[in-house]
Amino acid sequence: MYSILIACLVLLLCLIIYVGHRADHARKYLEGMWHGDPVFLKQSGLQSFYLYIQPDHTCFFSVVNKNGEKLMETKIPCTITNKIYMFFKPIFEFHVVMEDIHSYFPKQFNFLLDSTEGKLILENNHVIYAVLYKDNFATALGKTVKKYIT
């Protein structure tokens, strides 16, 4: 009887550690360079959309329309909290609050991260503001350059 109870407790502890580890991995995966999905860019009339998330969660946005005009090129401190792991899907939801308000984004929105596809969706109340993919090469290059500079 006690062995079954102990086995259940050990299993529960392993599950809690696994979920916590996955959430920490997602937070680290969130950092780096993200670029706009070509289909999303075409549908929204944009030439490019770049987002760089630093380890301290400062976000750099660069958005250019089809005419080559910069709509947004700014550094915005963001508070990224409340990671929610959708247990049966490899999707994490992060709530984002920007310290500065910008005309193209609401002050609060969500990052929906699918780490298996390397996909990040910026949304608020089911309105999609961007669909981005992780640029692993640019992220690795940035980390390498930072390592040699410091």
Swiss-Prot record:
Subcellular location field: Virion
UniProt entry keywords in alphabetical sequence: Signal, Virion
Signal peptide: 1-23
A single cellular component GO annotation: virion component
Family of the protein in this entry: Belongs to the asfivirus EP152R family.
Name the UniProt record assigns to this protein: Uncharacterized protein EP152R
Protein's organism: African swine fever virus (isolate Tick/South Africa/Pretoriuskop Pr4/1996) (ASFV)
